[in-house]
Amino acid sequence: MFKRLKKDIQVIFDRDPAARSVWEVVFCYSGLHAIWFHRLSHKLYLRGWVLLPRMISNFARFLTGIEIHPGATIGEGLFIDHGTGIVIGETAELGKNVTLYQGVTLGGTGKEKGKRHPTIGDNVVVASGAKVLGSFTVGEHAKIGAGSVVLKEVPPYATVVGIPGKIVCMYGEKVDRGEDDVDLRHDQLPDPEGEMLFCMQRHIQLLQEKITKLEKELKK
């Protein structure tokens, strides 16, 4: 038990440069607290308990802002960074050394029963705000970009970004999709709100030009 707790703490030191001391990690890292609470609730869930595991899960959500269903299966080495808003569904399965950032959802589509949440392979990174929805597999060493919405299977060593998610890299090499597209990095993801505002601004500008033209014609 203590060996596993020690490993949980070491994972944070390995992946978070902001970690300064063991006591800071133990008392101040909500992701670690969520994992510990889940470990307890999951054991009870596997023994056939229903209410108590859900109560523990709800208390953990209140304390940490992270919601992990007691039925979710989580491998060793999970690192949750800035975990507020993370949701992990009942039938989700996480492999070893997975990294999740704030706002990530590993959820279902609302249309399925039974296995309805994603399976995340070993060493996968899911960046801030990404949504992985459905009962498919995200292959080992894959990366999901911030704000992406992934609705279908991701092969190993792929990098996926955008809405809906598209593969832009495989094994670290850019994928040529035959499109005049930019190389979508973390700092170059699409901005739907910005694009919408730009379109509205352009539309208003065109209307103003038409009004000006009509006013000139009426004055003649």
Regions found by a protein language model. Name each.
Residues 1-59, 175-220:
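Terminal amphipathic alpha-helical/low-complexity segments used for targeting or macromolecular assembly
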Residues 61-168:
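Structural signal for interior beta-strand "rungs" in well-ordered beta-sheet cores
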